[in-house]
A protein has these predicted regions:
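Low-complexity, acidic/polar, glycine-enriched regions of mature
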Residues: 1-189
Length: 189
C-alpha cells in the first residue's frame, strides 16, 4: 500500500474514507492464547468497545480500545473466575484493559500499530502487527473496515505473575501471551 519513505493516504486505499469508525463488537473478537502445561488455553473477552479515527494520512490515524476484564471467557467457569481474581486480572479493582495508539506505520502491505496497553493500572508499550482486510458496505449501507492484528506479550510485565511450580522446574502457566484481534468497524455519521 505504501512504498518506503512515502505517506499512505486514504486515496491509496480504494474505498477508504477519513472519519471515525466504531468497533462492531458483534462482528469482532479480542482473544488470547497462553500455554498451560503442554497445551494452550484460548480465551476471549465478551465486552469491549473501540474507536478508530482514520485521517487522510494513515500515519496520523488513531485508535482507542477498552475491554471489560470481567468478561473473560475460556469455556471454564472455574478458570474464568480465577482469571478475574487478584491472581490475574483483579477485575474488581481494575475493571478495564485499555489500548491507546501512539503511531501507525506501513510495513509492506501491512502495518505496525504502536501503542500503550494498560492492565491492572500498569501501562507498557506494545506493537501490533496489523493486516488490513479492506473496505466494504454492511447490510445497512455503512462503510466498514476490517483488519486482523496480533502481538505477543509477557504477562509478568503487567504484574500478572501467578503460577504453580511443577516437578523438574517447570511452571503450570506460560509467561508469553499471544493477543489476537479480528475487527470490523463501521464509519459513523
Amino acid at each position: 500500500m505504501s512504498e518506503t519513505g512515502t505517506t499512505t493516504t486514504t486515496s491509496t486505499i480504494p474505498g477508504l474514507v477519513a472519519g471515525t469508525y466504531a468497533v462492531d463488537a458483534a462482528h469482532s473478537e479480542i482473544g488470547f492464547t497462553v500455554r498451560h502445561l503442554m497445551t494452550k488455553v484460548r480465551g476471549t473477552f465478551q465486552e469491549f468497545s473501540g474507536e478508530i479515527v482514520v485521517k487522510d494520512s494513515i500515519e496520523e490515524s488513531t485508535t482507542n480500545v477498552s475491554v471489560e476484564l470481567a468478561s473473560v471467557h475460556t469455556r471454564s467457569d472455574q478458570r474464568d473466575g480465577h482469571l478475574r481474581s487478584g491472581d490475574f486480572f483483579d477485575a474488581e479493582n481494575s475493571p478495564k484493559m485499555t489500548f491507546t495508539s501512539i503511531a501507525i506505520k506501513p510495513e509492506g502491505d501491512d502495518y505496525v500499530l504502536a501503542g500503550e496497553l494498560t492492565i491492572k493500572n500498569v501501562t507498557k508499550s506494545i506493537e501490533l502487527a496489523v493486516e488490513f482486510l479492506g473496505v466494504d458496505q454492511n447490510a445497512y449501507g455503512q462503510t466498514i473496515i476490517g483488519f486482523e492484528a496480533g502481538a505477543s506479550i509477557s504477562r509478568k510485565d503487567w504484574g500478572i505473575d501467578f503460577n504453580v511450580p511443577l516437578e523438574g522446574g517447570k511452571l503450570l502457566i506460560g509467561d508469553k501471551v499471544d493477543i489476537h484481534l479480528d475487527v470490523q468497524a463501521a464509519l459513523q455519521a
